[in-house]
């Protein structure tokens, strides 16, 4: 419970820093695969704390005025159409990533429209490939008992590029003075190219998106690193999309690379913001 409260204070502190720079925060809370597909859990059920994580984070965001659409409700409506998550992995499929990107784009268009002319992007499907996900790596069967492993998923990768240029033509823009209106920060849900979440966001938003997402770091560390970057200080975006899987809320991040005084100040600012939000209710 103490890690949940500390992480919520950090989230509120991040919001305060973004507000100071005129950046709108869109919190994309990714529901756990087990929450979306409880019918496959069998007799094992999550504990009480895990059962309430998604709603706790969503309610905290709403209480503090953070834009955070209910992605769980949207995905529950979509799950009958196609697989939203890989069978052998905790991550989403390219289709699931696309549906989330489209829902986020509708939220942006309704609540925080982007400035400037929209850009056009196109997404193409690449050749399918077998994919054994991270859930399989938890099973100590390979190589001696590999015949007992479940069959791999058939992943259909997608690639998105701007219609203004060919997919590989980025050399001219590399040294151009371009301010990206949208920044994406998050985890492997955003960073891994197999899901094409970044590309799906670009197409759905009609805007280029600069990604600072990282795999294997959780959602908090990439965000804190971005807040300390020259890119944020010198050229803050109009909108920042923070992809945040619910399962990280109770986890204690390793903050040893950051100045403890800075972290303490972020959490203090977050606590103050929470008190103000509570008084306003």
Task: Give the positions of each predicted feature.
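Extracellular glycan-modifying ectodomains
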Residues: 1-281
């Amino acid at each position: 419970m103490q890690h949940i409260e500390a992480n919520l204070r950090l989230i509120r502190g991040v919001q305060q820093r973004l507000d100071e720079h005129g950046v709108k925060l869109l919190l994309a809370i990714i529901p756990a695969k087990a929450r979306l597909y409880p019918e496959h859990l069998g007799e094992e059920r999550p504990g009480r704390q895990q059962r309430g994580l998604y709603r706790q984070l969503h309610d905290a965001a709403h209480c503090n005025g953070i834009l955070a659409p209910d992605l769980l409700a949207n995905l529950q409506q979509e799950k009958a159409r196609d697989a939203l998550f890989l069978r052998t992995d905790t991550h989403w499929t390219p289709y699931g990533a696309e549906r989330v990107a489209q829902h986020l784009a509708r939220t942006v268009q309704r609540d925080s429209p982007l400035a400037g002319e929209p850009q056009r992007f196109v997404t193409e499907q690449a050749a399918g490939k077998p994919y054994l996900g991270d859930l399989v790596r938890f099973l100590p069967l390979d190589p001696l008992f590999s015949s007992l492993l479940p069959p791999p998923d058939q992943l259909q990768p997608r690639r998105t590029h701007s219609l203004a240029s060919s997919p590989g033509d980025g050399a001219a823009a590399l040294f151009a003075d371009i301010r990206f209106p949208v920044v994406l920060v998050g985890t492997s849900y955003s960073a891994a190219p197999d899901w094409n979440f970044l590309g799906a966001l670009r197409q759905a938003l009609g805007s280029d998106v600069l990604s600072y997402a990282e795999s294997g770091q959780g959602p908090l560390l990439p965000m804190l690193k971005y807040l300390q970057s020259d890119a944020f200080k010198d050229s803050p975006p109009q909108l920042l999309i923070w992809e945040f899987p619910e399962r990280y809320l109770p986890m204690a991040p390793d903050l040893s690379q950051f100045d403890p005084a800075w972290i303490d100040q972020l959490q203090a600012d977050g606590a103050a913001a929470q008190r103000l939000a509570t008084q306003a209710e």
